[in-house]
Amino acid sequence: MTDSKPDALTYADAGVDIDAGNALVDRIKPAAAATNRAGVMAGLGGFGALFDLKAAGYDDPVLVAATDGVGTKLKIAIDTGNFDTIGVDLVAMCVNDLVCQGAEPLFFLDYFATGKLDVDDAARIVEGIAAGCKASGCALIGGETAEMPGMYAPGDFDLAGFSVGAMERGRALPDGVAEGDVLLGLASDGVHSNGYSLVRRVVERSGLAWDAPAPFAQSSLGEALLAPTRLYVQPALAAIRAGGVHALAHITGGGLTENIPRVLPDGLGVDIDLSSWSLPPVFGWLAQEGALDQAELLKTFNAGLGMVLVVSADAVDGLTWTLEDAGESVHRIGTVTAGAGVRYSGSLG
């Protein structure tokens, strides 16, 4: 009688391709290297990444950390096969938060998880991450690619980002917000990266395919809704350096209604004139197709303003010039007032 043994198994037989992971690292190294900045001490491949705060120019730094994802916007990227800019979204969601604390983003790490690694698709995503980092002056110093068979449906993946920034001690924001301060809104580049569960429901109701012409843009519907989140880091840092900025609010989930109060002291609120900027066409279409009322738009989406600065009244003109010089479209949208809450006048349009 002959003993028989089953064929020997490998990790690849279980669905994990280490060679593909190594190929991805080799593919993305040039993109990551292009993000290097003062303070970076080593390239990709170590067990941890090193960063020298003194070499980055800091004397007495306070570190600020942020983490985020891009939500179900990923589903549109997956459904359309368009992975070129979703990485920019990932970076923006983190670094735009950091700058609201007054911090300069220093470095970034990403987490990419999927059931089966497609090197080409993953490389496009990470190259987008690197592009967002480079535009923000932030180094891509590491990350994790997790191939986990059975955890994700075929073709699905998830992303998370982690970023660390710094400011000198005593310069953290918000600081000094007072009654009479002015709100300056910076235009968004579309829906950005929140509210996409509602967006996808509206698209489903409309009956339009992702490759159909967008009713509100000169592109396909999928391309229009994948427009990446605007990176506000460099303009915001320029404004902070100019002086007079008391707070910044990144307008993400919760919209203007919930994000502005996060940077206000107890007892203060804001009066906002909704007619002081134009509602971008994408939001008009979403409102019409989804029968969304104004309150729903304002608490779900950015409604055309991706960042709001709270500034001294006497600094408005100078800061407006600084921000416009950095490429931003600036709108004076309201003031800080006594009494907690966000009070709207006028209407979106």
Curated annotation (Swiss-Prot):
It comes from the Bacteria. Pathway: Purine metabolism; IMP biosynthesis via de novo pathway; 5-amino-1-(5-phospho-D-ribosyl)imidazole from N(2)-formyl-N(1)-(5-phospho-D-ribosyl)glycinamide: step 2/2. One of its GO terms (molecular function) is phosphoribosylamine-glycine ligase activity. The keyword Iron does not apply. Keywords: ATP-binding, Cytoplasm, Ligase, Nucleotide-binding, Purine biosynthesis. Pfam families: AIRS, AIRS_C. InterPro entries: PurM-like_C_dom, PurM-like_C_sf, PurM-like_N, PurM-like_N_sf, PurM_cligase. It is found in: Cytoplasm. Its main location: cytoplasm. Its EC number is 6.3.3.1. Signal peptide: none annotated. It catalyses: 2-formamido-N(1)-(5-O-phospho-beta-D-ribosyl)acetamidine + ATP = 5-amino-1-(5-phospho-beta-D-ribosyl)imidazole + ADP + phosphate + H(+). One of its GO terms (cellular component) is cytosol. GO terms for biological process: 'de novo' IMP biosynthetic process; adenine biosynthetic process. Coiled coil: none annotated. Belongs to the AIR synthase family. This is Phosphoribosylformylglycinamidine cyclo-ligase. It comes from Jannaschia sp. (strain CCS1). The gene is purM.
